[in-house]
Amino acid sequence: MKIITCYKCVPDEQDIAINNADGTLDFSKADSKISQYDLNAIEAACQLKQQLGDAQVVAMSVGGKALTNAKGRKDVLSRGPDELIVVIDDQFEQALPQHTATALAAAAQKSGFDLLICGDGSSDLYAQQVGLLVGEALNIPAINGVSKILSLTDSTLTVERELEDEVETLSIPLPAVIAVSTDINTPQIPSMKAILGAAKKPVQVWSPADIGLNSVSAYSTQQVAAPKQRERQRVVIEGDGEEQIAAFVENLRKII
């Protein structure tokens, strides 16, 4: 059984600064990290490996220069995957979800897999599209919002998905793609032994040409800015007489 778990490198939000002059966001000092939602996907894949015993977990990502960071690679591999595959190109920095999905699908097809697991969304965009688009590109079943994996055999996967007023139990044939929610598990913190062992695990670096993509479409970011702060109107009504109560009610009506 070969399981691919996809992840995205995103800027660490605590390092993002706001320029006071125009409200634009400054990412220059922001380190990259694994998207929080993808940590659940990695954990889910590694838990399945422990249950099955003979499974292989491959971490996979497409992106730009952030994927060249040795510390970032070690962070991923220390969380349990046996191998890492990264597809690197500068244009993937600003790739739209459908282009990211196309690249992931091509890389997964080249690598071979039985099950592909990704997070429900990414910490930066949270478009919640990539998992389903990968399934569409590969023409295989895909389910999003998975909150629990009930069983996995050589041919079938059974999962639970929580909706607003009900819980679905779904069975799909393999190969398949699932996007997991944060409810599925609590990602573990890697041990020192796992961190040291991560440096010995294999890493494959591919280009778009290696997976059969001649060009990578991307969008051009014009500006990323924080929303303008609005001044809050503070109305203080002193006293508890009828006039004050009437004024209080009138102000509430204006808000509603």
Curated annotation (Swiss-Prot):
GO terms for molecular function: electron transfer activity. Keywords: Electron transport, Transport. It comes from the Bacteria. Pathway: Amine and polyamine metabolism; carnitine metabolism. Gene3D superfamilies: HUPs. Coiled coil: none annotated. One of its GO terms (biological process) is carnitine metabolic process. Required for anaerobic carnitine reduction. May bring reductant to CaiA. Belongs to the ETF beta-subunit/FixA family. Heterodimer of FixA and FixB. HAMAP family: FixA. PANTHER family: ELECTRON TRANSFER FLAVOPROTEIN BETA-SUBUNIT (PTHR21294), PROTEIN FIXA (PTHR21294:SF17). This is Protein FixA. The lineage of its organism: Bacteria, Pseudomonadati, Pseudomonadota, Gammaproteobacteria, Enterobacterales.
